[in-house]
Amino acid sequence: MADKPDFGEVASFDKSKLKKTDTEVKNTLPTKETIDQEKKAESS
């Protein structure tokens, strides 16, 4: 059936074909305090 995964392709995967990438700095979520300050600034 088509809904069963084909693990043969995964087992024969060549890791050397992957490209090395530099990780970028992630955007962190604002803290609760920052959100509260922005809400107060918008309402006034």
Swiss-Prot record:
InterPro entries: Beta-thymosin, Beta-thymosin_sf
Pfam families from the UniProt entry: Thymosin
GO biological process, one term: actin filament organization
Subcellular location: Cytoplasm, Cytoskeleton
Record's keyword terms, sorted: Actin-binding, Cytoplasm, Cytoskeleton
Entries under PROSITE patterns matching the protein: THYMOSIN_B4 (PS00500)
Gene Ontology MF annotations: actin monomer binding
SMART domains xref list: THY
One cellular component (GO) term of this entry: cytoplasm
Function: Plays an important role in the organization of the cytoskeleton. Binds to and sequesters actin monomers (G actin) and therefore inhibits actin polymerization.
UniProt family annotation: Belongs to the thymosin beta family.
Protein name as catalogued: Thymosin beta-10
Lineage: Eukaryota, Metazoa, Chordata, Craniata, Vertebrata
